[in-house]
Amino acid sequence: MRCLLGLDIGTTSTIGILIDTEGGILATASRPSALVSRHANWAEEDTGLWWSNVCELVPDLLQSTGLEAVAIAAVGVTGMVPTVILLDDSGRPLRPSIQQNDARAVDEIEELKGRIDGDDWFRRTGGSINQQVVAPKLLWLARNEPDCFGQARTVMGSYDYITYRLTGDASIEGNWALEAGFYNLAQGGLDEDLVRLAGISPDRLPPLRASGEPAGAVTQQAAGETGLVAGTPVVTGCADHIASAFVAGACEQCDLVVKFGGAGDIMLTSERPVTDPRMFIDFHIVPGLYVSNGCMAASGSVLNWIVAQLGQGEAEAARAAGQSPHAWLDDQASDLPPGAGGLVLLPYFLGEKTPLHDPRAKGTLVGLGLHHELRHIWRAALESVAFGFRHHMDVFEEMDCGVGRVLACDGGAASDLWMQITADVLERPVERLLEHPGSSLGAAFVAGMGTGVLDDWSAIGRYARCDRVFEPDGSRTEAYRDAYGIYRDLYRRLETLYPALADLPAA
């Protein structure tokens, strides 16, 4: 039997998957990783932990299937984008990875805006200068960690780094360059002028490769550490949200995917690059397609924060009932009416990326009274993410992008309550892929297509199928429209206060 290995370098875990070539998922395994925030608005991860996770996952997957490593025909890697990893002359990371939702470089964003006209930037990149862009983070490093920055020989992203550790051959994938703000969409290829604006020379970026292109082969050293066979082909991977959209079945014009992870991704498939400064544009895994997309900096991570900081008693009650805290709180909040008893939450716990591009925005809860309970806050948080997705969908419609099917995936999609709220707020049916294997499957599939082991992009439908369709309930529509209007108005009213809050002393 030949199989394909997919690896996903995620925010909270590293995931591995083995699939066969007939639509079968042979095994999955994961190891925890940790987002570290040493200071306000910082988001970092340990690249060494990612690699050690990979070295543990491969033997686990092989052991659980009884397969030998020689059965693995190819490897693909996906991950968060655009993270920032600095390597020295020896290829060793100089510091922890700076994550895509890191919002430290507020001043540098404004500095960069002063160096290049925003319209010129948009014409080149199809996007705007925002907290996702890599250049401000590199400018921050040059200013605040000059010794480290001065030693940097190579800059790359998360899945590119693991690919490099496997093959010894450095490269960057197209979507890292595009979301980093270094890719000229009009001309095709890296824009050296934009790279220089970040304070680095273009030779600090490895060669650019498209998803599915050969990236090299597993080295003897990597084979010894991971248990893979030396010489196993490694294929250039892809951004995790794009892999996830592909696995969800978004392979046709106007397919919309909402991804309920730690962050909240929303992705619309198109046959041409439809751009807007408020949104991001990416290459689809399938050649010739594009993905107009947005990302809420925090969605599921807000729920995790509520459980960790406010829900200790509820967590104990959930354990006693044999439930997860999230499922228990869903049950408690399910009988509340739309609007969470008069509470509206803005989920800007890490600032906000699209469509606001405001790293100074803060998480906000409005409407609290002494009669409110944690279940009200919980429902307000669920509704806030749905409102955030509705905001993005409104922008897509302003861009003259038609929205067809709505597909929901990732961990948060397991919540029936959250899915029903989302269908009601979007006023559209939501198709859930409950058994969605995640981005790792997309990476494995790309590995198969890149090596010729697989030959049909549409065959992804054999691996992931719709679990349930949530129909919008018209009786809730008006109430949600009212609450959504308040949600949108709240940010406009508070926007001028957020910078003042940011200037207060940090804990």
Question: What are these model-predicted stretches?
Answer:
Residues A27-R31, P206, R468:
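Structural signal for short hydrophobic segments within the conserved structured cores
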Residues E68-A71, S201-R204, G402:
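Short loop/turn motifs at secondary-structure junctions
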Residues S64-Q100, T125-V134, T163-N184, P207-A210, ...:
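Short beta-strand-loop/turn "lid" adjacent to the catalytic site in phosphate-handling enzymes
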Residues M1-R95, R123, Q151, A223-G224, ...:
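N-terminal glycine/serine-rich phosphate-binding loop of ATP-dependent small-molecule kinases
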